Regions:
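Short hydrophobic/aromatic patch on the recognition helix
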Residues: 33-43
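Hydrophobic alpha-helical connector segments
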Residues: 52, 62-88, 100-104, 113-114, ...
Length: 189
């Protein structure tokens, strides 16, 4: 039973990466090698499955953040989160839509917020960001990335996201680097 759940989440991660979060869930069940009934027994709706995929991504971000250099933690996290957004267009928008209606989403969102708060506090402590920059400002960057992904040609989306990040980080950081760090997070599965 637990094994089916893990297979479904891994399949959803892969299918969302290939086709976006709005893909028919039949494709997820097929990729996982389970029937629709099994998928819906574990995940009663799309939002519950999206929440599980999001939790895997936040788990991976937390582990990755523990290995990042403290002096550039915020920049690395922003780049990684944007790369995750580009990796599965629509997933973060779906997570926001599920907030408050899907069990577990609020807790995963809280963990993601804590991760950003810690990174931002460290950046403020080191004088790496402009005074007054808040977690809401950083979240606005991710909303802009979602906007870029929604309108950009998929073939150019990653390059456009990198450019958007460069522009916005130059606005947030006190002494922005000449180049952004490269994404390095590898998701399980």
């Amino acid at each position: 039973m637990v094994r089916n759940r893990a297979r479904i989440v891994a399949a959803a991660e892969a299918v969302f990466r290939e086709h976006g979060a709005a893909v028919p869930l039949d494709r997820v069940a097929e990729r996982a090698g389970v029937g629709r009934g099994t998928l819906y027994r574990h995940f009663p709706d799309r939002a519950a499955l999206i929440a599980a995929v999001y939790a895997v991504r936040v788990d991976a971000l937390e582990a990755y953040a523990a290995e990042l250099p403290a002096d550039r933690l915020l920049e690395h996290l922003v780049v990684e989160i944007a790369a995750l957004q580009a990796d599965a267009p629509g997933l973060f928008t779906a997570v926001r839509a599920a907030h408050g209606t899907t069990p577990g989403v609020a807790e995963v969102e809280r963990r993601a917020t804590v991760l950003l708060e810690v990174a931002l506090a460290e950046a403020h402590r080191r004088g790496r960001v402009r005074e007054g920059v808040t977690v809401d400002d950083v979240r606005l960057v991710f909303a802009m990335v979602e906007g870029v992904l929604a309108v950009e040609d998929p073939a150019r989306a990653r390059a456009s996201v990198r450019r958007a990040l460069s522009v916005t980080l130059h606005g947030l950081l006190a002494d922005p680097p000449d180049d952004l760090p490269e994404p390095g997070l590898v998701l399980p599965g």
